[in-house]
Amino acid sequence: IDRYKNYWEITLKDKKKYQSRSLVLTCPYPQLKKLAKKYLNKKLLNLNVKMHPNITAMLVVKNHKEIPLSSIKTDTDVISWIANENSKKRFRSPLGLWTLQSSVKWANKNINKYKKKTRSTNSFFISEFCKLIGFNKNEVIFSNIHGWKYSYNFKKTVLSSYWDERQSFGVCGDWFLGSKAEDAWSSAFDLYKKIKKNPLIKNKRV
């Protein structure tokens, strides 16, 4: 990412370049500093942000039976949260659809190596789920696992978003405010209000 007189230029891995008058980044804090450190002010650079990883699995279970619950929070070392997707009534399916989220402790231990042993990690995750719910592992007919190295920041920062009208440069993300999906929306809305109040200074050299 480079800033010139009155525009931004982004260079991709394939060397393609894109220019724009304004730039808004929404990415985890460690990646933000790596991409745009020289364009951030001291207040943003000095935020106390600790990002935690998460590993999530999506499962399909045959012989689906109606289960009267929408989600479960657990205190096990491996799984922290289980969602029963069928309970949301967004669609009808004869199959059981589930989403699992790992505990922070287990994700910290496995986030850097799960891709090298995806099959065994996935199998272990499914086994832990079946123990909790009471399913037979053979009933799981599909599963997919994915990890985010920088998934959560549990502590709110002193900022809700960042906007520099001189550079026409903004930043938003859930990590400004917490770990929930709503925090991402709130941060983006806060950035919108800042841009509306202090829009781009046209032709301003920086």
Regions found by a protein language model. Give the residues of each.
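FAD-binding beta-loop-beta segment adjacent to the flavin cofactor pocket
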Residues: 88-94, 142-171, 175-177
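Active-site-proximal substrate-binding core of FAD-dependent oxidoreductases
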Residues: 47, 194-206
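Generic structural signal for small/hydrophobic residues in well-ordered secondary structure
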Residues: 24-26, 59, 100, 143, ...
